[in-house]
């Protein structure tokens, strides 16, 4: 059995088409979760890693009554594996996993925070593994446009949407966000090394609020080693940090 060990929880990493990855961990660490948040949604939860990181972050604060972190996934195996990971974690009381596509998800609540690490290989050749294709190709499954449309109507007042995408999709993401009344408050561009262009972008949107976004950059590697900036971010999660 494939298990990824974090400092405070383990992730079964076998049945989900998309495995534990740096993108998801960074999204969970950087998403603007607040102690007052009660309803949190992870769209395309996969193994549940993002939701688990968020739960660990909340565990350092008094968790309010009624707090729920929900992870949804279109893939039955992924949702089942996330459910196992949630139930075996220290925060099983606030985590729940659902097998459902976003298009059919009709919750009876709004959300204070929505996060997603959606598929992003728009122009890639179709993956021969149908489940991985759904997990990785926007044409086959979940798209950030669908997420933006959902967030427009489902974010509570003051709610936030946080998405990680390849950096070359940032302009389109911001443009479509504006079309749905969502405006960026924070933009974090991620570089593998300083000399290269950013490879990923984490954008946080707020519903209805217009402001000049806070922009920052994270460099992961320098001279063959992890940067202090990166290690400082992941030190509570990865065993190597």
Set out the residue ranges of the language-model regions.
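Conserved Class I SAM-dependent methyltransferase catalytic core
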Residues: 16, 20, 141-198
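SAM/dcSAM-binding transferase cores
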Residues: 197-241
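Glycine-rich SAM-binding Motif I of class I
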Residues: 48, 52
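A short acidic, Gly/Pro-enriched loop at the edge of an enzyme's catalytic core
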Residues: 104-114
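Mobile active-site "lid"/loop adjacent to the S-adenosyl-L-methionine
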Residues: 118-146
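Conserved SAM-binding loop
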Residues: 82-83
């Amino acid at each position: 059995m494939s298990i990824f060990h974090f400092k405070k929880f383990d992730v079964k990493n076998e049945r989900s088409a998309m495995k534990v990855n740096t993108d998801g961990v960074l999204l969970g660490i950087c998403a603007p979760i607040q102690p007052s948040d009660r309803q949190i949604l992870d769209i395309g939860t996969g193994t549940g890693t993002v939701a688990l990181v968020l739960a660990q972050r909340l565990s350092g604060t008094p968790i309010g009554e009624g707090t729920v972190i929900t992870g949804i996934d279109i893939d039955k195996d992924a949702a089942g594996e996330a459910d196992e990971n949630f139930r075996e974690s220290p925060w099983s009381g606030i985590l729940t996993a659902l097998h459902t596509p976003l298009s059919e998800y009709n919750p009876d609540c709004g959300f204070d925070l929505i996060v997603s690490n959606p598929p992003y290989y728009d122009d890639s050749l179709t993956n021969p593994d149908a489940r991985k294709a759904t997990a990785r190709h926007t044409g086959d499954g979940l798209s950030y446009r669908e997420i933006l449309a959902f967030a427009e109507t489902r974010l509570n007042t003051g709610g936030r949407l946080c998405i990680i995408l390849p950096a070359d999709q940032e302009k389109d993401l911001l443009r479509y966000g504006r079309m749905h009344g969502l405006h960026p408050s924070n933009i974090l561009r991620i570089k593998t090394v300083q000399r290269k262009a950013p490879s990923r972008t984490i954008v946080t949107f707020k519903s209805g609020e217009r402001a000049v976004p806070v922009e920052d950059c994270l460099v992961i590697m320098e001279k063959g080693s992890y940067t202090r900036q990166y290690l400082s971010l992941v030190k509570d999660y990865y065993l190597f940090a």
